[in-house]
Amino acid sequence: MPKKYRVEITEAAEADIAEIWEYIAQDKPDAATAFILRLEEQIGTLEHFPERCPFVPENELLGTAYRHLLYGNYRTIFKIVESRVIIMRVLHGAQLLDTEMLEG
């Protein structure tokens, strides 16, 4: 049986998700809700095989070991710590990651 991880979402990531909803909802509230539900489903899949997701390209520059899950135009930045998957941020794919985004 595959190992199951506990997925934890930081306050910063929760705020990112709320911001994404607000941005999409300006034009299409129903689409915003549907997108967020699907995004949360995708995040939930990290309970199993989070290693399937690639490392973020910024790791070399930042000296970190973060991975990302891509969905739509967004990437969910996370790290694996023992049996936990910690969701650090949910960012637009064009946005580069820096250490200030990961503090907190």
Language model regions located:
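Enriched for short, Lys/Arg-rich terminal
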Residues: 71-104
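Basic, Lys/Arg-enriched alpha-helical interface segments
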Residues: 1-64
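Short, low-complexity, polar/charged sequence segments that are solvent-exposed and flexible
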Residues: 26-29, 65, 88-90, 97
